[in-house]
Amino acid sequence: MDGSAACRTLIVLAWCRVFAARRNYLRTRMISVEKIGGTSMSAFDQVLHHIMLQDKSRIYGRIYVVSAYSGVTNQLLEHKKTGEPGIYALFANGQDYMVALANLADSLKAINAGFVSLGLPLDVANAFVDQRIAEAREHLNALRHVLASGYLNRKSVLLAAREILASIGESHSAFNSVEILKAQGVRAILKDLAGFHDSKAWTIDERIHHSFKDVDIANSVIVATGYTKGTEGIMREFDRGYSEVTFSKIAVEVRPDEAVIHKEFHLSSADPNIVGLANAVIVGATNYDVADQLADVGMEAIHPKASKPMEHAGIPIRLKNTFEPEHPGTLITKDYVGESARVEIITGSEQVTLVEIHDPHMVGTVGFDLGLVGILSRHNISYILKATNANSIVHLLWDKAVTPELIAELQAKYQVVTVKPCAIVCVIGSNIAIPGVLARAAQAMAEAKVNVNCISQTLRQVNMQFLVDREDYKPAIIALNRALCLPSRAFVPLGCE
């Protein structure tokens, strides 16, 4: 090699080092807001090593919005799936809740004991539990006396009690997280947004703004509670989905490079519990429109009312699997469209009911469905799907929305009202507006002996919706995933993974 060639080589190497250094610098300066759910929080050793400490160059510049440990909010409010009452129901029904609060303290301390090996100072953590339970007891007792007076609206008082109780779980997990991080030598800051020790009449946005306005995020690790106290009441609209609202509002406030949601699973082409893990394809990339479609049938990547502010702010959301830290997960952005036509997700729900109105006078009548929509509105019902023909209108509703009162009002006004429990199966993708997808979907279900009761698709063609009998829900998911998401991969029979 002559001198000039050697010189050029040295220059190239030098520039490579410069670019590598700059890339590493930018990586270390990246700001992210990250939500960690309750199931992941209960496996905090995995969270600590797979998320918080996994990349030594990315320890700082991160805000973690944490949920309560798995099962705690069920104990505080009610079981999310079964509805089994918790402490809130005791308060709301005028029953004694002191013993339940004492049992809660024991449960939280048992959780604390499980994290001693990670460096959690047990005496400090247990003292926090005792203090917070005592404060909550005082607040609840005060509310009970106010409720007994009859001077204030019962609904507002109960909502305040519900928020006080809900906040305990997030404050507990956030406090523990900070103490464990400090024990690991990390500069960690607690942002307890429950506001137990202040009486400021801030809105949720104001509390978040004041909490983060003077924080050096780039050089800190911040752990924030998923619950935020505010004058409007975060649970008034979102109830158990409040942690996503806090996550969203913090992201909009600090404008991170990325918002990350850590779950115990990947966003995949179909539920691995139905199709088998080997047949569940990780989505990888999609857009906010697809995320909205998922939420509409109960498969929430993130609640639409929490995601919309981030979408408008241009903040990308990354969904990651807590237990696979090296995998980039799935990135949700505003304008993503797949380079090639591809069905991304097959999903749906078995917890839906078809309500059909049949009336021969409907044909040619302008605004016939206006009265029907008015009835749904009075019952505070949002429908999932709507389909019509000359004499019939079908609305797909969540099971819990189909009350005897609703059906009685419909039957009093319309000739024939048919109520049929069923299931919805959706074929979703950011780029599926091509000939043949609907035909392949119908063929796949026909081969699986699945009868389609109703079909819906809009002009944007991001979501094909099929109503099927409930017993056909899982066979339909398996058939559609196999036909539309695994065309170039070998199907692995269930049980053979």
Predicted regions, residues:
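A conserved regulatory-domain signal marking ACT and ACT-like small-molecule sensing domains
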Residues: 328-497
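Leucine-biased recognition of intrinsically disordered, low-complexity hydrophobic segments
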Residues: 10-13, 26
